[in-house]
């Protein structure tokens, strides 16, 4: 150990410290990325008996084929049922330990605490979910106050602790306190639960037992597919067997679906083929997500790549460390084997060498804790990560790091220790192991392996970034660069719904008078996002499904949609509709076609069952024109049938402005703020989005991970460069005499540099051949979620290889320049 400490400040100390720093940096990157990976892979695993807690889906191939004809984004699995079918499921199997239905009657509501004098206080926005009474037997709630028995009274609600603090302050007790809901009357607090972790499908909302009347209505409803079912299977129950049992026991269930699936809740997160469309409840797009219970999807490919990068960074750093250890063998081998000649035993010598590796790895791990602590304290990666990086929240990640700390010294110290002591002492003392073929091949093999791994990451990232560039720059069929969207908060939008003209008309009029604005309009959905309203309407005797955008009469000219036939809206065209070409081709539509909206009435019989009775349909709209197809949603969805429909007094959510020039955006925003303050008296707080802003929000997960992958890729490349730096340093020292002799026989400095560079370029070429197909496969896995994608150009691979080659050549040239410039006489005589 004395020799070890002395060597820290020897000529080889710089390489040691560089290696130690690289390993420490790898630990930091591993911790940050792996914490995020663990956040995803442990999604909804906090439930008791998590493997038996399932969400129920069904498949119906005929329905899927029909729906995909009109909606390409319709998925294979569907999770929303009619209440009647859910009752059939519950009545036809005994394989559920417990089960509850969640009725889609939720509304974003205001909940007002009632004070001691019976006066309502400041309301708080929340969401109410109505369920059947087995909720707490399926999901695991951490009840802080109250008793789940109180849930059996539909006058009680259970709320999260965060909402209790907003309603009543941070001092309890809360149970028994009264609140007034704007859509469901007075309720009592029956219990308070600890907020769910962020990696859960379950939202921190208000849960209330559905009234018997509401349950009866849903149980008898065969038509409205808006309800969901969550179950806990009995021990030993198999989802496939339960599905077969249901199909055998009920003709209604056989008619409804081809099969039923019981997917563990922790697996639902990574499902990409599940439809939740009927659960949309409109809420602010930018600052909130659409309220869809359980609609949180993770991209398994991106998470897998992120985990791969985290491990590769550490693995590459470990290889670097092994390579450095092997490069030090020629400096250790003679000293160790001289000791063997004088009687030293192998085991103590090997243990002495391994102690150095143990101390190095422990030092690197300890050193990494400082930047990790700094990152946690300053919340540096909050914009990129979902995970909480605090040490107490990442036990699995810390255990993984501990495993590396234990295993790495065994490999990095064990192999060189065995290698140094495995030769006959006499041969070692008389020979020169510095340039032995075995040692050289091993070092180059490790470097090649490092570069193969890092090039896989770099090439994959290059392809990912090409698709990202495409998302921002591809033609979308309207003038995205000139569009500025102002979002009206939901609360104010609801307030002005019945008096739209008192806010919208003065606002639009003022905007049109500004010379920096070419046109202004409004709509109920933003363009370029995944959220759009769907309609099923009757036309020519058939029910047609299409996306619909409710707009002002001048919307098409504002956004730049181009007519192909017919005319644009006029202020008198109430309920006029303009369809895209996809709709015309699929449905054979023509100008003048009329659409009708089906209407139903629910009649309750003496037993309390509801029957849905059709009523005469009402006119929904008529076609006045057709327009070119445009990417009105995100690039994950194919262009589907879509209509713009002009309707007054609708729920206005977005003011849409066409700028005279993109550079005038800030000027226009200031003007809109001034007008908004005057018209709404400061009650409306507009949120502004450009076209690129909406793209960023739509692909926020992908873009966050791409940023993380970018930094990870940089480090996976830098760490092998450190290895190249050390290896060239070693080889130039070991080959000083060879270089001198070559120069005596006429070799030039340029020739020497080319010799060194060609060795590494050949290695890089082999690495590229191996890495390119792997990167191609990884990219294809990710790109499958996009209906529209950029072509995979060959030159992307060439450019990536060229950049890597240039950086490596610069590193090799800089490091070997001094040796190549030395005078031959000096190098030969030394």
Please tell me what each predicted stretch does.
Residues 6-15, 249-310, 331, 376-400, ...:
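Membrane-helix entry/capping segments
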Residues 19, 40, 56-58, 89-90, ...:
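Generic structural signal for small/hydrophobic residues in well-ordered secondary structure
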Residues 32, 357-423, 466, 759-821:
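Small-residue-rich transmembrane alpha-helices
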Residues 30, 34-173, 181-186, 251, ...:
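Structured, solvent-exposed hinge/loop segments at the ends of secondary-structure elements
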Residues 2-10, 14, 18, 317-360, ...:
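Intracellular coupling helices
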Residues 131-145, 157-297, 509-698:
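Mid-to-C-terminal secondary-structure elements
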Residues 11-41, 51, 440-467, 478, ...:
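Short, strongly hydrophobic transmembrane alpha-helices
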Residues 15-29, 303-323, 356-368, 397-405, ...:
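Alpha-helical transmembrane segments of integral membrane proteins
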């Amino acid at each position: 150990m004395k020799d070890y400490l002395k060597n820290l400040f020897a000529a080889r100390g710089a390489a040691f410290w560089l290696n130690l720093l690289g390993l420490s940096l790898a630990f930091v990157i591993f911790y940050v990325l792996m914490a995020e990976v663990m956040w995803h892979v442990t999604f909804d695993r906090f439930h008791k008996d998590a493997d038996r807690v399932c969400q129920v889906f069904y498949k119906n191939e005929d329905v899927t084929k029909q729906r995909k004809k009109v909606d390409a984004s319709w998925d294979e699995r569907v999770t929303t049922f009619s209440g009647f079918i859910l009752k059939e499921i519950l009545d036809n199997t005994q394989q559920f330990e417990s089960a509850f239905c969640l009725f889609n009657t939720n509304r974003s509501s205001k909940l007002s605490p009632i004070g001691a004098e019976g006066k309502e206080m400041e309301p708080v926005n929340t969401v109410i979910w109505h369920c059947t009474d087995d909720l707490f037997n399926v999901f695991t709630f951490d009840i802080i106050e109250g008793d789940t028995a109180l849930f059996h009274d539909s006058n009680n609600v259970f709320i999260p602790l965060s909402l209790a603090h907003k309603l009543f302050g941070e001092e309890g007790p809360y149970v028994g306190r009264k609140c007034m809901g704007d859509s469901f009357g007075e309720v009592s607090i029956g219990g308070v639960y600890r907020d769910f972790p962020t990696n859960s499908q379950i939202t921190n909302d208000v849960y209330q037992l559905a009234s018997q009347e509401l349950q009866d209505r849903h149980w008898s409803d065969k038509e409205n597919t808006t309800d969901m079912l969550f179950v806990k299977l009995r021990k030993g129950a198999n989802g496939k067997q339960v599905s077969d049992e249901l199909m055998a026991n009920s003709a209604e269930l056989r008619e409804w679906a081809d099969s039923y699936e019981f997917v563990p809740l922790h697996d639902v997160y990574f499902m990409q083929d599940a439809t939740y469309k009927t659960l949309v409840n409109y809420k602010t797009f930018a600052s909130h997500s659409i309220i869809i219970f359980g609609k949180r999807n993770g991209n398994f490919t991106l998470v897998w790549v992120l985990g791969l990068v985290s491990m590769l960074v550490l693995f590459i750093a470990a290889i670097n460390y092994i390579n450095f250890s092997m490069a030090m063998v020629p400096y250790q081998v003679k000293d160790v084997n001289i000791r063997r000649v004088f009687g030293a035993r192998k085991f103590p010598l090997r243990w002495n060498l391994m102690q150095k590796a143990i101390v190095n790895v422990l030092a690197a791990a300890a050193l990494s804790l400082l930047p990790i602590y700094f990152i946690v304290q300053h919340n540096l990666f909050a914009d990129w990560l979902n995970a909480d990086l605090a040490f107490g929240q990442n036990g699995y990640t810390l255990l993984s790091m501990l495993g590396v700390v234990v295993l790495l010294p065994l490999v990095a110290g064990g192999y060189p220790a065995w290698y140094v002591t495995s030769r006959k002492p006499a041969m070692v003392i008389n020979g020169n192991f510095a340039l032995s073929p075995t040692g050289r091949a091993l070092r180059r093999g490790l470097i090649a392996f490092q570069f193969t791994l890092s090039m896989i990451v770099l090439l994959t990232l290059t392809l990912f970034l090409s698709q990202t560039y495409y998302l921002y720059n591809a033609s979308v069929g309207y003038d995205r660069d000139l569009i500025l969207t102002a979002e009206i908060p939901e609360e104010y939008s609801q307030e002005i719904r019945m008096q739209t003209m008192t806010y919208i008309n003065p606002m639009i009029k003022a905007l049109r008078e500004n010379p920096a604005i070419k046109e202004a309009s409004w709509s109920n959905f933003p363009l370029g996002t995944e959220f759009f309203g769907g309609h099923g309407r009757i036309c020519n005797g058939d029910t047609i499904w299409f996306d619909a955008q409710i707009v002002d009469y001048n919307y098409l000219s504002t956004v730049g949609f181009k007519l192909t036939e017919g005319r644009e809206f006029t202020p008198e065209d109430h309920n006029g509709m303009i369809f895209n070409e996809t709709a015309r081709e699929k449905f054979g539509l023509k100008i003048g076609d009329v659409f009708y909206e089906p209407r139903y009435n629910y009649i309750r019989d003496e037993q309390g069952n509801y029957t849905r009775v059709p009523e005469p349909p009402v006119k929904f709209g008529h076609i006045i024109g057709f327009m070119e197809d445009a990417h009105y949603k995100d690039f994950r969805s194919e262009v589907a049938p879509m209509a713009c429909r002009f309707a007054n007094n609708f729920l206005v959510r977005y003011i849409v402005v066409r700028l005279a020039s993109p550079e005038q955006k800030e000027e226009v925003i200031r003007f809109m703020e001034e007008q908004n303050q005057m018209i709404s008296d400061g009650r409306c707080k507009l949120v502004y989005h450009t076209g690129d802003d909406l793209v960023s929000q739509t692909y926020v997960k992908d873009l966050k991970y791409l940023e993380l992958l970018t930094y990870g890729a940089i480090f996976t490349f830098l760490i092998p460069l450190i290895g190249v730096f050390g290896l060239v340093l070693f080889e130039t020292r070991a080959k000083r005499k060879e270089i001198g002799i070559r120069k005596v026989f006429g070799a030039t400095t340029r020739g020497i540099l080319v010799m060194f560079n060609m060795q590494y370029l050949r290695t890089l070429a082999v690495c590229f051949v191996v890495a390119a197909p792997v990167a191609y496969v990884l990219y294809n896995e990710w790109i499958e979620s996009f209906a529209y994608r950029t072509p995979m150009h060959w030159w992307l691979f060439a450019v990536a290889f060229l950049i890597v080659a240039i950086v490596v050549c610069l590193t090799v040239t800089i490091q070997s320049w001094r040796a190549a410039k030395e005078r031959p006489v000096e190098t030969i005589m030394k």
